[in-house]
From Swiss-Prot:
<dbReference type="GO" id="GO:0003677">
    <property type="term" value="F:DNA binding"/>
</dbReference>
<keyword id="KW-0238">DNA-binding</keyword>
<feature type="domain" description="Topo IIA-type catalytic">
    <location>
        <begin position="737"/>
        <end position="1223"/>
    </location>
</feature>
<dbReference type="InterPro" id="IPR001154">
    <property type="entry name" value="TopoII_euk"/>
</dbReference>
<dbReference type="InterPro" id="IPR036890">
    <property type="entry name" value="HATPase_C_sf"/>
</dbReference>
<dbReference type="Pfam" id="PF16898">
    <property type="entry name" value="TOPRIM_C"/>
</dbReference>
<feature type="region of interest" description="Disordered">
    <location>
        <begin position="977"/>
        <end position="1015"/>
    </location>
</feature>
<dbReference type="InterPro" id="IPR014721">
    <property type="entry name" value="Ribsml_uS5_D2-typ_fold_subgr"/>
</dbReference>
<feature type="site" description="Interaction with DNA">
    <location>
        <position position="786"/>
    </location>
</feature>
<feature type="binding site">
    <location>
        <position position="109"/>
    </location>
    <ligand>
        <name>ATP</name>
    </ligand>
</feature>
<feature type="region of interest" description="Interaction with DNA">
    <location>
        <begin position="1068"/>
        <end position="1077"/>
    </location>
</feature>
<keyword id="KW-0413">Isomerase</keyword>
<feature type="binding site">
    <location>
        <position position="522"/>
    </location>
    <ligand>
        <name>Mg(2+) 1</name>
    </ligand>
</feature>
<keyword id="KW-0547">Nucleotide-binding</keyword>
<dbReference type="InterPro" id="IPR013757">
    <property type="entry name" value="Topo_IIA_A_a_sf"/>
</dbReference>
<dbReference type="GO" id="GO:0003918">
    <property type="term" value="F:DNA topoisomerase type II (double strand cut, ATP-hydrolyzing) activity"/>
</dbReference>
<dbReference type="InterPro" id="IPR050634">
    <property type="entry name" value="DNA_Topoisomerase_II"/>
</dbReference>
Length: 1263
């Protein structure tokens, strides 16, 4: 027999298979649809604690067993009384009585009773209709705004249907009548109403005995009674009535007292409440430091307990979570915080009054009403957020997040035993064995240093020494996120190679694969930084290891060597620091007679030199130790001062000393440790976030004469940081912050110096070739790529880059599309100096500049002296240790006008940021705050055409931004439709036929799905961006220089955005430009903060005017000397012609010594000419034979007269006059230059112009 025949053994009839029930029957047959499950459920619920002591919580979270359907019919009657309290002003008393023995429940309230009258349309008493007829209600008017709980016409009738007895008693005082009616047998049987006269006050009382059999119960158990009693306390809080339970008044009748029932004042819980900001919203947040409670939402809507929350909770919680997240991100920037991580630490109370609320089901556990239609809006206050922050929850959230993330770091732990293999790792033979702790891992700065170490291993062997190269600098782990640390390949490699376990406290080193780390890095500031980063890594995660002296070591390789002699008499002196070399030079005739070789990188050494270094390993090994005892830092850091150097050439290190200007934002030059353990303090000072101001003071203490003694082989971490690592921080600032006088950072100055020396005004040169020339000539040590980027940046001229580019961009040097990131490779680019540079940097000034020296070579000046402050012409930005700077450029014409005002003792006029070819506007907000506003035109009602963006907003980025807005807007609009549809579906989950049958929706069949869909929809809608949802589409017609975006909005949305003031900010059509971080090195080499453009200009003019005087004095002296030389040359030639000086006698030339003796006898003076070091007669002896003529005499006399006239003209001019003349010459050249630049720009802008838009009705740069 088939399965089919078996299943149809007793087939149902058609009538049995297809049934029709009326609504009354359906409610009893399908309780889940109306009141929820009628079976017992065991779960945690908030209930009243009958056994609570005076200081104990009265409402507790406890596991109970109850029947949801029974709870719901009870709740319907409770909400019915609450609704009456809202409707009727005279309803101010509600009494709830529960007899646990009989199971009888009654709810009484005063106030207006129900109309005791017969309904004319339906011919039935009104109380009978309301409580005994299904789908009857006073809440069907959709045009009326109601803030009650009832709405669907079921309400207390559900309690009637699920009761064995249900009575309604009400008094209509207006008619002087009292109504009483009794229902039994699940509302199937009803007695005739009893109407009597009654002269006292109105009231309504509902009494019922649930049908316990239908709920599988015999009576009201303790759990259910505790749950019902808690609900009465809810009623006391959510209404303004006096509420009684079993004749005892509940005094905890306000929001604060109600929350106190859960979390009394004596508990450890931290409570923050806002019940006054908005009359329709009461909000509380509880932080549980004991971490015993899970995240909870205890919420109410119009006295209904929304146990699953809803959109009202999401609106409140979302704001609070966002506020806390902002605070947390500020405090711990690198910790990844998700909203759920914040919520899990908090309990939220929300009591909201919502107009015409919508719920997902008849059980009304979850509000689905759209937030926009609440009838009110709760906005969390800053005070409230601060109150929550004060509870300490943010620290807990950060700690939890770090604990989670750090747990992931354990996945990258190393092991003390066994092999570890990495591509570039050369393990010690004993590593990972029982003798592993005796091994040393040599961490090298790159592959070249690895080769140096491998050469050295030929000397010391491989048994106890392993080598692993680092790729650049190690990550600063102290403030990095655990995820970033876990993803860092080098951090992971070191952990596995050494055998380090995350968080382990090491009592000894025997469990490690390597018992020490040796750092092999270049002897320069970047090498110091690498050492510090490795120390920081170990100290941050394994502070116990740095307490072992020598766990971290470094190899002191030579920075330079002085060599003298050859063979057996050869002498070699090695130096590991520039300071020790300078000290040696002082004692050894400035190094004369010695050959000096500089080792800027370990790759400079050949294998023999590497082996030589390792042969004397112990003498070159520096071991670091922990020094907790406090030192007198003040006397140590300020023990020496640097003498001023007035010579034209000075050592670079001298320029760095004490460079923080007394007028800067932080002026202290004494750093005092914040931690009693000075080594601990030094570590966090150098690497930890939050100590930026301390680092500024620390940098200010720098003294180049306070350096590590190279003879010491034991150095404390404290001394390393304060004497060696500090030089990296100082150098970092020097590289990042430009000089007031020329607007150059060191790399820019080197490029300009090399370009002038190469004289590339006429002949263009490849950028890659110029990079090599500049690097070699100026001793640049930070890589060709960095220098090439500097050259490219100096030649860029797109909007937002240079206002006046000194180098010409001959090739694709980058555009406004990406902010210059789209430049071609340096090997494809050519450049040359713009002729206008000659009018800015005057040749006469080059001889008075103070040059630096390095490797015993003269390099670029400390700063140049342009005739206008190029820092204001082109602006600058940079970030260094402790200091950053951001200076926006100005119009050169405004700058020149103000210089001339200052030269005549007038006050300069206020300048504002200016960018060449920017067509948008720069507007002053207040003080030092400006904004850059885009230029756009409004076309019709729903379209704007953007023709320029705020400066610094690049075209590609803006296009991506608009693409993202379109995607967001499409999603938001779809979600809103989906939400609207979901709400509509929730309202119509039951469709009633004439016979009363109903059909459930898909979500009704799957309540979990309904709950999930509602939550996801409302969450997304709550985050909607009004600008994104307003945009319909956009198009663009941009090029590398042209901006052209046309944005079309949905009808009416553009006008709304303009009126609300959200258009410009929402579309990023404005960008702030603040003049609040203008740091510069001044003429003394000290960093100074300037508050205004005027302050920069005044400082520049003061110094530049002195330099004009210095130049004048120098030229007068130089020209007088040149006149003297011309005069004595004339006299010499005349003496030769006259025979007073005899060069030839008897057909033979006289000896040079005889001629020089004759010059001395005739009192001819000696002069220093050209590159000569001492005065001599070179100016005479260099005269050629054919210049000993009368024609040459006349020529020299003419030169002498011209020079005399030139000198007289210069003597007659003041420095101010000289400057003004040069400014005028510059303006004349600048006019020509600017005209050509503008013509070229406009030609490119208008060439092959794209499609034209409609004519605008209104053009504006919107405010």
């Amino acid at each position: 027999m088939s399965k089919t025949s078996k299943s149809n053994k007793n087939p149902k009839s058609i009538e049995e298979k297809y049934q029709k029930k009326n609504l009354h029957e359906h409610i009893l047959h399908s309780p889940d649809t109306y009141i929820g499950s009628i079976e017992e459920k065991t779960c945690n619920m908030w209930i009243f604690n009958e056994s609570a002591g005076e200081d104990d919580a009265k409402i507790i979270f406890k596991e109970i067993t109850y029947v949801p359907g029974l709870y719901k019919i009870y709740d319907e009657v409770i909400v019915n009384a609450a609704d009456h309290n809202k409707r009727c002003q005279t309803c101010n008393i509600i009494k709830v009585d529960i007899d646990q023995k009989t199971g009888q429940i009654s709810v009484w309230n005063n106030g207006d009773g129900i109309d005791v009258a017969i309904h004319k349309e339906h011919n039935i008493w009104v109380p009978s209709m309301i409580f005994g007829e299904l789908l009857t209600s006073t809440n069907y008017d959709k045009n009326e705004e109601k803030t009650v709980g009832g709405k669907n016409g079921f309400g207390a009738k559900l309690a009637n249907i699920y009761s064995v007895e249900f009575t309604i008693e009400t008094v209509d005082a207006n008619k002087g009548k009292k109504f009483f009616q009794r229902f039994t047998n699940n509302m199937y049987d009803k007695e005739e109403p009893k109407i009597s006269s009654f002269k006292k006050s109105s009231y309504t009382k509902i009494t019922f005995i649930p049908d316990f059999k239908k709920f599988g119960l015999k009576c009201l158990d303790d759990d259910t009674l505790a749950l019902f009693k808690k609900r009465v306390f809810d009623l006391a809080m959510t209404t303004n009535a006096k509420v009684y339970f079993n004749d005892k008044q509940i005094v905890q009748n306000n929001f604060k007292k109600y929350v106190g029932l859960y979390f009394p004042e004596g508990s450890q819980h931290k409570v923050v409440i806002d019940d006054t900001t908005h009359e329709r919203w009461k909000v509380g947040v509880i932080y549980d430091p004991t971490d015993q409670l899970e995240h909870q939402n205890i919420s109410f809507v119009n006295s209904i307990c929304t146990s699953r929350g809803g959109t009202h909770v999401e609106q409140v919680v979302g704001q609070i979570v966002n506020g806390l997240k902002t605070a947390i991100v500020k405090k711990a920037k690198n910790v990844q915080i998700k909203p759920a991580m914040i919520k899990e630490n908090l309990i939220f109370f929300v009591d909201a009054t919502i107009v015409n609320p919508d719920f997902d089901t008849q059980t009304k556990e979850y509000l689905t009403k759209k937030a926009a239609n609440f009838g009110s809006k709760f906005e969390v206050t800053e005070k409230f957020i601060k109150g929550v922050i004060k509870t300490g929850v943010c620290d807990q959230i950060i700690a939890n997040a770090k604990a989670r993330e750090e747990a992931n770091l354990s996945k990258t732990d190393g092991k003390g035993r066994g092999p570890v293999r990495y591509e570039k790792l050369y393990n010690a033979h004993k590593a990972g064995t029982k003798e592993g702790y005796k091994c040393t891992l040599i961490l090298t700065e790159g592959d070249s240093a690895k080769t140096f170490a491998m050469s050295g291993l030929n000397v010391i062997g491989r048994d106890y020494y392993g080598v692993f190269p680092l790729r650049g600098k190690l990550l600063n782990v102290r403030d990095a996120s655990p995820k970033k640390i876990a993803d860092n390949e080098e951090i992971t490699a070191i952990k596995k190679i050494v055998g380090l376990e995350q968080g382990k406290v090491y009592d000894d080193l025997k469990g490690l694969r390597y018992g020490s780390i040796m750092i092999l890095a270049d002897q320069d500031v970047d090498g110091y930084h690498i050492k510090g980063l490795i120390m920081n890594f170990i100290h941050c995660f394994w502070p116990s290891l740095v307490k072992y002296e020598g766990f971290i070591q470094s190899f002191a390789t030579p920075l330079l060597k002085a060599t003298k002699g050859k063979g057996k008499t050869k002498q070699v002196v090695a130096f590991t620091s520039p300071q020790s070399f300078e000290e040696w030079k002082k004692e050894n005739n400035d190094g004369k007679g010695w050959s000096i070789k500089y080792y800027k990188g370990l790759g400079t050494s050949d294998p023999a030199e590497a082996q030589e270094c390792f042969a004397d390993l112990n003498d070159k090994l520096v071991k670091y130790f922990w020094e907790p005892k406090k030192k007198n830092l003040e006397s140590e850091s300020n023990s020496k001062s640097v003498d001023s150097n007035k010579s034209k050439t000075t050592n670079k290190k001298k320029i760095e000393s004490e460079f923080i200007e007394e007028e800067s934002d932080i002026i202290s030059d004494t750093y005092k440790p914040k931690n009693k353990d000075i080594s601990e303090d030094a570590m966090t000072l150098a690497f930890a976030g939050g100590r930026e101001d301390d680092r500024k003071i620390w940098i200010n203490t720098y003294n180049p004469d306070n350096y590590l003694d190279p003879s010491k082989k034991r150095i404390s971490y404290y001394d390393f940081i304060h004497k060696e690592l500090i030089t990296f921080s100082v150098d970092d600032v020097l590289r990042s912050v430009p000089n007031l006088m020329d607007g150059f950072k060191p790399s820019h100055r080197k490029v300009f110096y090399g370009s002038v020396e190469k004289n590339i005004y006429k002949q263009e040169i490849k950028v890659s070739d110029l990079t090599g020339f500049v690097s070699n000539m100026t001793k640049y040590h930070h890589g060709d790529q960095s220098l090439s980027s500097t050259i490219v940046g100096m030649a860029q001229n797109y909007v937002g880059s240079n206002n006046l580019n000194l180098l010409m961009p001959l090739g694709m040097f980058g555009s406004r599309l990406t902010g210059g990131k789209d430049s071609a490779s340096p090997r494809y680019l050519n450049t040359k100096l713009d002729d206008l540079a000659k009018k800015i940097f005057i040749d006469y000034d080059f001889d008075i500049l103070q040059h630096q020296s390095e490797d015993n070579c003269r390099i670029e000046p400390v700063y140049y002296a342009p005739i206008i402050p190029m820092i204001l012409v082109n602006g600058a930005e940079g970030i260094g240790t402790g200091y950053s700077t951001k200076i926006y450029p100005c119009n050169p014409r405004d700058i020149i006008a103000n210089i001339k005002r200052l030269l005549t003792n007038e006050n300069p006029k206020t300048m504002k940021p200016w960018f060449r070819h920017l067509t948008g506007t720069i507007e002053k907000i207040d003080g030092a705050k400006y904004i850059s506003r885009a230029k756009y035109e409004i076309i019709g009602k729903d379209t704007i055409h953007i023709t320029d963006l705020p400066v610094g907003i690049w075209t590609d980025n803006y296009k991506a931004f608009l693409d993202n807005l379109i995607v967001q807007g499409t999603a938001q609009n779809a979600e809103e439709k989906k939400a609207s549809k979901a709400v509509s579906s929730a309202k119509n989950t039951k469709t009633t036929t004439k016979a009363g049958s109903k059909t459930g929706s898909r979500t009704r069949k799957n309540p979990a799905l309904a709950k999930k869909s509602q939550k996801s929809v409302t969450a997304k809608v709550a985050k909607k961006n009004p600008v994104a949802s307003s945009i319909k589409t956009y198009s663009e017609d941009c090029t590398d220089i042209r901006i052209s975006f046309t944005i079309v909005f949905h009808p009416g949305k553009l006008d709304t955005l303009i009126k609300s003031g959200k258009l410009d900010t929402g579309l990023k059509l404005v960008k702030p430009l603040n003049l609040t971080n203008m740091h510069l090195f001044n003429e003394k080499g000290k960093i100074k903060k300037y508050d205004t453009y005027g302050a920069i200009l005044r400082n520049f003019v003061k110094v530049r005017l002195n330099l004009y005087q210095k130049r004048k004095d120098y030229l007068l002296g130089k020209w007088k000397k040149e006149m003297d030389i011309l005069k004595w040359k004339v006299k010499f030639i005349e003496y030769v012609i006259e025979g007073k000086i005899v060069i030839f006698k008897n057909g033979k030339s006289k000896k040079k010594e005889e001629v020089l003796k004759a010059l001395e006898d005739l009192k001819f003076p000696k002069f220093i000419v050209g590159n000569e070091s001492y005065p001599s007669y070179g100016y005479i002896t260099s005269i050629g034979l054919f210049n000993l003529t009368l024609e040459e005499v006349e020529k020299l006399k003419k030169q002498l007269a011209d020079k005399k006239q030139e000198l007289a003209i210069l003597e007659a001019k003041s420095p101010e006059e000289i400057w003004e003349e040069e400014l005028d010459e510059f303006v004349e050249a600048y006019d020509i230059w600017e005209k050509e630049v503008d013509e070229n720009y406009n030609d490119l802008l208008n060439k092959k112009k794209g499609s034209t838009g409609k004519k605008s009705r209104k053009t504006s740069t919107q405010k």
